[in-house]
């Protein structure tokens, strides 16, 4: 990847020195979650962000407004922790939907609260949801998440579909010895219920720092397993671009399955994302070890133009890649729950 000169090409977009332009903003609304997934959080002992450190609803909407009107952001995805635990979520969505230009809005969730919120979120302006579900077996779900809420997730998925938050996407992480035999069953279930299934390689973002590359279920493993039951055809001839998922038609279509090979086939060269943590820090990458503080600028009454300048400068320094293959790779201190997916 070639670097650009320091001329700051594209002064009104979030461009980096490799020419990548961020148009997709991930906003973490909380670091708290009502599950304890083994690949994300420890069972106990996490230090939560203090309430005064969290961005307020007004601060979140203001930063999104700056991103959309001054920095070229076209899509906003709300994440967590678990974003449905944020009391003001529906109001935030409604206010962002009123921005000009209006960004596309989606939500990544564990689905537990969707049964009671899906209709309100759709009415407020949310476009679609991504729901995490790694298994069809309640006992395995309890082992993976340390909570007995499998039925709630299934009901939440159904509620999202009925509310029109479509396409409903389901994200699944396969873990060796736990659910790595479920790929074909998960796909058959997704096809039956008209959900779009995406398998994601486990990434080194667990709070315990116990991830090992040699122990993960790879994209290749997943595709091999799926092909024992389904005919998979690579969708179209277009390059993958900034889309993280390699998509396949299932038995000739119309249903599709995606595989996100974040570790074995990373898409860093086409990354179009910028991330905002629940306490107002800009992160250029899931695996970044540096952050840029926007909360301090907000609370010191900095004008929008200054906040946009700080944000552009942060993204200008984005690294070429996550560096997972680099022997010097260091896992971020923040676990996934405190970064936002």
Swiss-Prot record:
Keyword Coiled coil on entry: no
Residues bound to GTP: 26, 77, 108, 169, 273-275
Keywords: 4Fe-4S, GTP-binding, Iron, Iron-sulfur, Lyase, Metal-binding, Molybdenum cofactor biosynthesis, Nucleotide-binding, S-adenosyl-L-methionine
Record-listed [4Fe-4S] cluster 2 binding positions: 268, 271, 285
GO aspect biological process, one term: Mo-molybdopterin cofactor biosynthetic process
Residues reported in the UniProt entry to bind [4Fe-4S] cluster 1: 33, 37, 40
Catalyses which reaction(s): GTP + AH2 + S-adenosyl-L-methionine = (8S)-3',8-cyclo-7,8-dihydroguanosine 5'-triphosphate + 5'-deoxyadenosine + L-methionine + A + H(+)
Annotated GO MF terms: 4 iron, 4 sulfur cluster binding; cyclic pyranopterin monophosphate synthase activity; GTP 3',8'-cyclase activity; GTP binding; metal ion binding; S-adenosyl-L-methionine binding
4Fe-4S recorded as keyword: yes
EC number of this enzyme: 4.1.99.22
Gene3D superfamilies reported for this sequence: Aldolase class I
Family: Belongs to the radical SAM superfamily. MoaA family.
Quaternary structure and partners: Monomer and homodimer.
Name the UniProt record assigns to this protein: GTP 3',8-cyclase
């Amino acid at each position: 990847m070639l670097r650009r000169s320091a001329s700051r090409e594209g002064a009104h977009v979030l461009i980096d020195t490799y020419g990548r332009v961020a148009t997709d903003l991930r906003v973490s609304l909380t670091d708290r979650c009502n599950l304890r997934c083994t690949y994300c959080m420890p069972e106990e002992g996490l230090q939560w962000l203090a309430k005064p450190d969290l961005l307020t609803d007004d601060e979140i909407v203001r930063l999104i407004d700056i991103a959309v009107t001054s920095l070229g952001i076209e899509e906003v995805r709300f994440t967590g922790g678990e974003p449905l635990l944020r009391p003001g979520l529906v109001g935030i969505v409604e206010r962002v939907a009123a921005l000009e230009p209006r960004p596309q809005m989606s939500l990544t969730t564990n689905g537990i609260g969707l049964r009671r919120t899906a209709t309100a979120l759709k009415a407020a302006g949310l476009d679609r949801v991504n729901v995490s579900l790694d298994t069809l077996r309640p006992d395995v779900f309890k082992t993976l998440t340390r909570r007995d809420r499998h039925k709630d997730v299934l009901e939440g998925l159904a509620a999202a579909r009925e509310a029109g938050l479509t396409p409903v996407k389901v994200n699944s992480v396969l873990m060796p010895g736990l659910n790595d035999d479920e790929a074909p069953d998960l796909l058959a279930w997704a096809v039956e219920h008209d959900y779009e299934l995406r398998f994601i390689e486990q990434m080194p973002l667990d709070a315990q720092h116990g991830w090992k590359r040699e122990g993960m279920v790879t994209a290749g493993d997943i595709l091999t397993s799926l092909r024992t039951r389904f005919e998979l055809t690579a969708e179209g001839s277009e390059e993958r671009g900034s889309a993280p998922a390699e998509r396949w038609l299932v038995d000739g279509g119309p249903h599709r399955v995606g595989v996100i090979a974040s570790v074995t086939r990373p898409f860093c060269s086409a990354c179009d994302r910028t991330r905002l943590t629940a306490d107002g820090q800009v992160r250029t990458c899931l695996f970044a070890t540096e952050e840029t503080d926007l909360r301090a600028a907000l609370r010191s009454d900095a004008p929008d133009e200054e906040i946009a300048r700080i944000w552009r400068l942060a993204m200008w320094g984005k690294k070429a890649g996550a560096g997972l293959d680099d022997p010097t790779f260091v896992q971020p201190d923040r676990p996934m729950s405190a970064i936002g997916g």
